[in-house]
């Protein structure tokens, strides 16, 4: 599997795919730096006027509803329509789905047309049960709780969707294939924007891998392994953030192999 990961990263760094990000303002800087570290070329757009052109230039479209308002909703819906027309993959992070009515409704609309969806267990469960309430961006549920919902959602999506349920344990499925991943480090949950950036990395991997399940699986594994390597070098979240970017960039597969083969 490390060989597949290496090949995908080499393609990323050779092709430098453009990823259009329609995302939140909280994690935008860190997200852009993660894209650059792995070799992708991010565009962070906030204008409806250039959507058609930018999606035409992009290899994937990343939607993240972290900072939601009516203008963002209109922009994201229009981006989906254009991306479908241009046959571009849509990678979606349903931040806060299940927390408020509007977030849940927007998430349901965007889910139907997504190529990859990534969220913690509570966000994924909110798609299957409108009565579920979540705690902002945090999850009160475990990955195991969300497995059946994730498989059902993957089978219901219109675009052959892969669902990535992430947390202490990660679960990836496209409805037919599934993978459980036990990598990463608890310190990753103490850095704002880490989940948003993980979804961005999945968008980058999907831009060079046509199989959404494989793109999600390899992206989650690479991101998690980089977190483990960064944790070796620090004790707290401040330095961790910097070292994590270094590890994304370094792609030290010799060090990764120690964790991957345990």
From Swiss-Prot:
One MF annotation (Gene Ontology) recorded for this entry: hydroxyethylthiazole kinase activity
Pathway participation: Cofactor biosynthesis; thiamine diphosphate biosynthesis; 4-methyl-5-(2-phosphoethyl)-thiazole from 5-(2-hydroxyethyl)-4-methylthiazole: step 1/1
Keyword Nucleotide-binding belongs to the record: yes
Ligand binding (ATP): 118, 166
Catalytic activity field: 5-(2-hydroxyethyl)-4-methylthiazole + ATP = 4-methyl-5-(2-phosphooxyethyl)-thiazole + ADP + H(+)
Binding site for substrate: 44, 193
Top-rank lineage group of the source organism: Bacteria
CDD domains: THZ_kinase
E.C. number(s) listed in UniProt: 2.7.1.50
UniProt keyword terms in alphabetical order: ATP-binding, Kinase, Magnesium, Metal-binding, Nucleotide-binding, Thiamine biosynthesis, Transferase
First and last residue of the signal peptide: none
Keyword Kinase: yes
GO BP terms, alphabetized: thiamine biosynthetic process; thiamine diphosphate biosynthetic process
Record family assignment: Belongs to the Thz kinase family.
Role played: Catalyzes the phosphorylation of the hydroxyl group of 4-methyl-5-beta-hydroxyethylthiazole (THZ).
HAMAP family reported in the protein's UniProt record: Thz_kinase
Stated name of the protein: Hydroxyethylthiazole kinase
Gene for this chain: thiM
């Amino acid at each position: 599997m490390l060989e597949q990961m290496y090949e995908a990263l080499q393609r990323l760094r050779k092709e430098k795919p453009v990823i259009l990000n329609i995302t939140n303002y909280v994690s935008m800087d860190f997200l852009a730096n993660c894209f650059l570290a792995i070799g992708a070329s991010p565009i962070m757009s906030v204008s409806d006027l250039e959507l058609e052109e930018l999606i035409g230039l992009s290899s994937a479209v990343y939607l993240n509803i972290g900072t939601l308002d009516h203008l963002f909703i209109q922009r994201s819906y229009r981006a989906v329509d254009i991306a479908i027309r241009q046959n571009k993959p849509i990678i979606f992070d349903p931040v806060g789905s299940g927390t408020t009515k509007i977030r849940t409704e927007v998430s349901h609309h965007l889910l139907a047309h997504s190529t990859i969806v990534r969220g913690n267990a509570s966000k994924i469960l909110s798609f299957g049960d409108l009565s579920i309430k979540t705690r902002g961006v945090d999850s009160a549920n475990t990955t195991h709780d969300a497995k059946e919902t994730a498989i059902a959602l993957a089978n219901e999506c219109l675009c052959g969707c892969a669902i990535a349920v992430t947390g202490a344990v990660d679960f990836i499925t496209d409805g037919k294939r599934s993978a459980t991943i036990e990598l990463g480090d608890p310190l990753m949950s103490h850095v704002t924007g880490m989940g948003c950036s993980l979804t961005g990395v999945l968008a980058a991997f999907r831009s060079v891998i046509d199989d959404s399940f494989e793109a999600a699986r390899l992206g989650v594994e690479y991101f998690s392994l980089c977190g483990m390597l960064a944790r070796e070098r620090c004790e707290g979240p401040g330095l961790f953030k910097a070292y994590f970017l270094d590890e994304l960039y370094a792609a030290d597969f010799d060090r990764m192999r120690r964790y991957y083969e345990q």
